[in-house]
Structure formats: structure tokens, C-alpha cells
Amino acid sequence: MTKKKAHKPGSATIALNKRARHEYFIEEEFEAGLALQGWEVKSLRAGKANISDSYVLLRDGEAFLFGANITPMAVASTHVVCDPTRTRKLLLNQRELDSLYGRVNREGYTVVALSLYWKNAWCKVKIGVAKGKKQHDKRSDIKEREWQVDKARIMKNAHR
């Protein structure tokens, strides 16, 4: 009988796209796998990824991640030509792809990458169907966030 591996401390999250939640209303989230090359996996293990400008395009019945930047490590990629911003294929079920096609074809909707993380030994990306926010929506979100902080401060001082 084999022993269970000890859980490694640390976060499984590689990269977050905080700007996406500020710029868009996220209506639905999907988890997708990524088709990666060897040097990309090694760079992701080192945490050298940025998905702040990334988005998903659907074409020919497949989904592709554009704009994600995975910086190559100097020691990992000496004999391979590395393109840090290459297009990466997303691995989704046909049912999930059909759902994405149906939602994105509506006016004003897009698909953005929300986070990049490890699930067991596999690299996953969380994508969301998003609708752009107007300026007044962003302001109301900031006011709501500030009110939550003020409310927490008031409650903390009330218990003293």
C-alpha cells in the first residue's frame, strides 16, 4: 500500500487577473485545462506568469487563450525557441464549448481569463463569461468596497 504524499505548503494559485473583476461583470465561470509545452510548465512552477491582458477567442469549435505571458526561464529553454505570448489551446468539453459559443454570441459579452492555478499536477485556467462595466458601475463597486471596510472598522471598535 502506498503512502499519501504530504501536502506541500504554499498556494496553488499561479496568477490572478484582478483587473478582470474590476472591468467586467463575471456571469459564469468555467475551468479549463491548458495545452502547454515543457518549458512553460517549468516557468509556471517558478511562478513566472501574467494573465492580466489575456482573453479567450472561440474559433473552429475550439477555444484559445491569447495574451497570457509566460516568461521563459533561462536554464529551462536553451535549445527551444520560446514565444512568451504564444496562443495556447484550452481543453474544454464539447458541452462547455457549446455553452461558451451561445453566451459569447450575445452583444457585449466576452470570455476572459480569471486565474491560473495548479489542480493536482495539472495547470488549469479559470475563465469567465463577462460583460463590460460602465464607469458608474466601477464607482459604485469602489463605494461598496469602502463601505465594507468602514463597517468592519466600526464593528471592531464597537466590541471594545
Curated annotation (Swiss-Prot):
HAMAP family xrefs: SmpB
Domain of life per record: Bacteria
Gene of this entry: smpB
One Pfam family hit: SmpB
GO molecular function list: RNA binding
Protein name, per record: SsrA-binding protein
Deletion phenotype: No visible phenotype during growth on solid medium at 16-42 degrees Celsius on rich or minimal media, no peptide-tagging of proteins translated from mRNA lacking a stop codon by tmRNA, i.e. no trans-translation. 4-8 fold increased susceptibility to a number of antibiotics (norfloxacin, gentamicin, trimethoprim, tetracycline and streptomycin but not ampicillin), very significantly reduced production of persister cells. A number of bacteriophage development defects.
Biological role stated in the UniProt entry: Required for rescue of stalled ribosomes mediated by trans-translation. Binds to tmRNA RNA (also known as SsrA or 10Sa RNA, 363 nucleotides in this organism), required for stable binding of tmRNA to ribosomes. tmRNA and SmpB together mimic tRNA shape, replacing the anticodon stem-loop with SmpB. tmRNA is encoded by the ssrA gene; the 2 termini fold to resemble tRNA(Ala) and it encodes a 'tag peptide', a short internal open reading frame. Able to recruit charged tmRNA to ribosomes. Does not play a role in transcription, processing or Ala-aminoacylation of tmRNA.
Organism: Escherichia coli (strain K12)
UniProt keyword annotations, A-Z: Cytoplasm, RNA-binding
CC per GO annotation: cytosol
Subcellular location as annotated: Cytoplasm
GO BP term, pick one: trans-translation
Family: Belongs to the SmpB family.
The protein's assembly and partners: Binds tmRNA. The SmpB-tmRNA complex binds to stalled ribosomes.
Taxonomic lineage from the root: Bacteria, Pseudomonadati, Pseudomonadota, Gammaproteobacteria, Enterobacterales
Note, other: Although the Fu et al., electron microscopy paper indicates this protein came from E.coli its sequence maps to T.thermophilus. The same situation holds for Ramrath et al.,.
